């Protein structure tokens, strides 16, 4: 998903380091990246727009590496885990996803479910955490808007 500007990528298993780096929305195009397993460090680095979902299926540990959202100034990251993300950069806010948040990504989760034969009950069996840029984010002022 490097510098992705639109479209969807669905990964059944794991992804490596710097997954989703430099993703950015462009006009009506919103990139979507879904990882069924876990990711390495620097997930969503410099994320400027779009949606990243990490499901951590068959994972007991937190399914993302270190430095999640470093340089993030747009977009959203959803991480499925019963363990809250820790050691996030100051420009990233984390909240436990509410029903309204899940309803926004439900069609993407259903698409993943259909593609890979993973039951929605399994996907929804753990909590999701929603990561967004901090409104007081010092990075946003360094970038131009679309």
Q: Positions of the model-derived regions?
A:
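Long, distal/terminal scaffolding or interaction modules
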Residues: 1-146
